């Protein structure tokens, strides 16, 4: 595989990984909602603690702001669930270009739709990890040879580049000591 095909394969793998990324984002939102709900339901202070009475001027909107935050997060979760469903359809559309009963398709479905780790895939098939990987790479190559998939890759190259640059930027921000060689 030459450099151009490697880049196209990377874009294709990124496209196939969209369910995982959407599910990961939804999980983050779910965890945030749980954390805010726990804060809302947590007891205040210790034994015998009584908060001072608040003024009724309407400026103390603590409980209301928590409810608004929760409502906003619930709306984001609903939107993210829709994104997960759309991602599943997009990935299934791509995988439809592989032969119906092929091992390549089964491996790709286990990896990208069911989001199984390689260990589970190799046990499910059953094949060694290296054989599963060879079949997976063969599937990627088969997909790269389809005209419609090639057009989809071209349509997604810019989004992939943006995602990749954003990921690299976050990595650089995380470890400034690595940049300076310290």
What residue ranges belong to the model's regions?
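Helix-turn-helix DNA-binding module
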Residues: 114-131
């Amino acid at each position: 595989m030459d450099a151009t095909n490697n880049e196209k394969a990377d874009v294709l793998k990124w496209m196939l990984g969209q369910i995982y990324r959407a599910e990961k984002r939804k999980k983050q939102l779910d965890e945030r909602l749980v954390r805010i709900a726990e804060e809302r339901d947590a007891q205040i202070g210790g034994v015998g603690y009584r908060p001072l009475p608040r003024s009724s001027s309407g400026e103390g909107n603590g409980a209301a702001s928590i409810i608004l935050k929760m409502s906003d997060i619930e709306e984001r979760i609903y939107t993210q669930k829709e994104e997960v469903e759309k991602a599943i359809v997009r990935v299934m559309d791509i995988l439809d270009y592989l032969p119906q009963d092929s091992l390549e398709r089964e491996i790709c479905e286990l990896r990208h739709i069911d989001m199984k780790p390689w260990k589970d895939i190799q046990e499910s098939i059953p094949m060694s990890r290296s054989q599963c990987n060879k079949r997976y790479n063969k599937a990627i190559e088969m997909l790269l040879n389809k005209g419609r998939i090639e057009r989809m890759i071209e349509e997604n190259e810019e989004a992939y580049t943006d995602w990749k640059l954003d990921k690299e930027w976050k990595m650089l921000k995380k470890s400034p000591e690595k940049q300076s060689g310290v």
